[in-house]
Amino acid sequence: MTRALLVDPNFSSVPIGQALAQHGIDVATVGRKTSEGQYTNHFDIDYSDRAAMRALLQRERFDYLIPGCTDKSYESCSALAVDWGFPALDSPETFNQLYSKSKFRALCHALDVSVPRVFTSEQEALQSNAPVIIKPDDAHSGIGITRLDLPTTTTLSKAVKVAQDFSSSGRVVIEEYVHGQLHSYSAFLQDRQVHCAFHVAEYGTLNPFAVDTSYVLPTSSHELELKNCAEKIAHALALDCGLLHIQYLAKNSDICLIEATRRCPGDLYAMLVTRSTGFPYAAAFGAPFIAQPISKIESPKFHRYLIRHTVSRETFNLMGRDIFETGAAVEAWVPIANDLGEGVPDASRAGILLLPAANQADVMNVIAAIYGRGSALKQRIENRPSREER
């Protein structure tokens, strides 16, 4: 039987494993086991340990290597593919071109693709008199980020230090803060052209730099421009096939790209797209890694409004069943961790809510309710007793 190693055992990668199994492939997973794990054929190995991974591949002789929903997963697969020749995985150089914020911005600048203005020094940022945002060059998911509307020498230096602490390389990006609504453009490539793509509006209801709420848009006025951007990047980096997932800010007729990745987005993004459009997102993501063409996968068949909301453990514990009071019926509640006890960090996710909506206005009402609940949650967090007082 054909065998594949899925390099991510956590809940967001489950749809990928299920799609692979539908091809009759025997799927194993690798990674440090968590309470999210749902696989019996699992190797409890740190997949960032290249020596251990090489030993595993040498011993087990898998036919395919499949990245999951984390940057570290794709980075590990990229490095291993150099020696093992697994299909459709980017080289480490290509991975870094997208993963590094500074390299990605330089690439986009060379391709005449709009990205935020990058400052070469703290002094240049201060002299610009513009609002700035400071980010680790090689960390994602909203960590280590500071926004300064009126930066000073002191506040900017402090923000740079925070970003450096979250960067494995110690590098940071200081750029002009761009106002706009966050979106993702999730494009599947075949022969360096966009076969099909999805537009998703994204919100951070608790942390403005970390997405926890999103829904698929039926159309976008930026479709042609984004397609052009994606294909420019695909040709420049020789991305023949597979996913190119872009996050961008939109304001009126303007767009500004923020980052791009080739991994599958997490928090059941694949499920959101599939339930909203009928398109088998997880199957399309996995197809190139098992040498199957994306072009044979049918395009979306319909559109329905469905909101995805990620609930943290802290929210779950403080709000209880109030998390379901958003003004919408609950289509699905997908718990992430089997154990929500004291051993699970507050920042970890308790589960994913899927909330159907009748139309665009209904979507915005539900999201407003989620934002309102977030304000109530913040009050509860601020007013709750400290651990010493409990």
Where in this protein do the model-derived segments appear?
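Conserved ATP-binding module of the ATP-grasp superfamily
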Residues: 114-116, 133-134, 145-180, 199, ...
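Peripheral (often C-terminal) accessory segments that flank ATP-dependent C-N-forming ligase machineries
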Residues: 110, 286-390
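A conserved helix-loop-beta module that forms one wall/lid of the active-site cleft
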Residues: 82-151
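ATP-binding N-terminal substructure of ATP-dependent carboxylate-amine bond-forming enzymes
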Residues: 1-94, 295, 358-385, 389
